[in-house]
Amino acid sequence: MNIWEIATNYYQYFLRGTRTTILISLLTVFCGSILGCLIAFMRLSKFKPLEKFASIYITVIRGTPMLVQLYIVYYQLDFISYPTGTLFDVDLERALACIIALSINSSAYVAEIIRAGIQAVDKGQMEGARSCGMTNAQAMRYVVMPQAVKNILPAIGNEFVTMVKETSIIQYLGIGDLMYNNGIVVTSTYNPLPCYYISAIIYLALNIILGKGLNIFEGRLRKSER
């Protein structure tokens, strides 16, 4: 079978896998952004134990392979009781393990993105807000963060693009993402090369679409600064 025949005869597998890949990526970036925001503020904290914990957390997560983290989380969940079932036709136990592991991994990178975005804001902004009678929390909320967000959001968008590709490791837990379904088609056709070409094209198309969306978003952010 050639690439066109495989694409037309097995398109439902590729579509199903693409849906799962996008879903896991969205949930991962959402959860990772929330956790990353918390870690970033801990990293910026003047309370040394919190700052130290965040620093160690980021070092450990960024310094170990994502696949190892995925297996650790998956086997660790065996000791935790939680609801069983399915999430969009995906086994809930495995889906939770993937979302948790990928979110933890993403949070370490998001934390550094947020920290860098906040530190990129001129320190005079904070000092000016404080001189106007604002507390640290008020100055951060009303003065620093609105400016930092313009630096942070495009980078988090790039993290989403990266995560779409990195979710390919969840196939090792039997999650029906794009690469898992690609494997099913390879087994059925005994012709792996066209299958991998199709998967590569889908990943490329997803990232091009996301990249274009990010460019439009960044353009609007720049216009709002004028």
At which residue positions do the language-model features occur?
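Transmembrane alpha-helices and adjacent helix-loop boundaries
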Residues: 1-226
